[in-house]
């Protein structure tokens, strides 16, 4: 019964983590930027980001913990080790975004009064674009790794 509960918690954490990322990345953010002005959309997304990243941290810690617990209970194998390592890398990606990237993005954004008034070659705009690109890349990598984790999980599940 303990194994069933661990599997349930593991599956729920992965579903909420990857599902939340997919929803925000492919549905919410594009719609927000389509409907609102760039300034307003940026403010909405900036308000969502702390919650978005905390969801990733909480779900990542739970997924990592339950994956380790399942490995201990069911004996480690190559796929379970790979899955657990990938989850750890995903969690590191989220933590990197929270601890390193987001403070830098916020610091640059605080210096920008309006994106509309900034020239395309303005150093602040270029720095914001560079940081945004790095943040996008980390987010995409975490999402893609999450899909790999989901595949490994589906491949190793016993019904």
Predicted feature residues:
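Polytopic transmembrane helical bundles with strong interfacial aromatic enrichment
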Residues: 1-159
């Amino acid at each position: 019964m303990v194994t069933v509960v661990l599997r349930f918690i593991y599956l729920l954490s992965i579903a909420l983590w990857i599902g939340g990322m997919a929803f925000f990345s492919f549905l919410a953010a594009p719609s927000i930027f389509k409907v609102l002005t760039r300034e307003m959309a940026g403010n909405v997304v900036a308000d969502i980001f702390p919650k978005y990243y905390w969801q990733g941290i909480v779900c990542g810690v739970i997924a990592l913990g339950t994956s380790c617990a399942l490995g201990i209970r069911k004996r480690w194998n190559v796929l379970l080790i790979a899955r657990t390592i990938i989850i750890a890398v995903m969690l590191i990606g989220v933590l990197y975004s929270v601890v390193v990237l987001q403070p830098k993005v916020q610091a640059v954004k605080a210096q920008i009064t309006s994106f509309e008034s900034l020239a395309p070659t303005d150093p602040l705009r270029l720095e914001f674009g560079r940081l945004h690109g790095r943040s996008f890349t980390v987010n995409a990598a975490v999402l893609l790794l999450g899909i790999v984790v989901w595949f490994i999980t589906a491949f190793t599940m016993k019904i």
